[in-house]
Amino acid sequence: MSSDFTVKVFFRGDWCPWCSGYLKDFNDQALHKIQELNGKIVGITSQVGNQSQKELGLNFDIQIDEENIEAKKYGIFITPKAETPLKDADGIYPNGMVQPGIVIEDTEGKILYKWAIIPSEMNLGGASERPLVRDIVSSLEQILKGQESGNSFNKTDMNYLEHNHPEEYKKVQAYIASLNK
């Protein structure tokens, strides 16, 4: 059975606690509704050897796009390998690291929704300030009904991560503490 649209979730990698929490949100909060609307979700990363689907128990596919072809197609920001947190790891991001983004595209290639982060110090290098999954689904429902969608979304932040994904929050806190040593 073919889908009417695809939700493409671009993420940095399985090492990123923000990405893990976000993928879990799509799996737990959006997958059923997206399927009801005759759509599908696919995660896209440029991390070679990514294990997110297996490690997180995701019920949607993960596509490894080490050339960043999909990211370039949609204008999703790509951090050069030398500037990635894993710059010293051989073969992990040979062509740079895709940053978080969401593209919802119909079967004819029409973009129904797009959001992409621009990494900065204020959003922890592209990790935080993602639109909440429930807001994306709500916006998609409006679009599919032919209504205009507002683009004001609540966004992920440290408080959100702490309350919704406490284990991932601890990883971020440990990373921040390591930077302050």
Question: Where do the model's predicted regions map?
Answer:
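Thiol-/selenol-based redox modules, centered on thioredoxin-like
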Residues: A89-K181
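Short, internal strand/loop/helix patches
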Residues: Q53-Q99
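Short, glycine/serine-rich, charged loops/turns that create anion-binding
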Residues: D14, V48, P119
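A short local loop/turn or secondary-structure capping micro-motif enriched for an aromatic residue
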Residues: S2-S3, K81, S120-N123
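Short active-site neighborhood of thiol/selenol oxidoreductases, capturing the structured segment around
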Residues: M1-F26, K40
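Structural microenvironment flanking redox-active thiols in thiol-disulfide oxidoreductases
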Residues: G21-K72
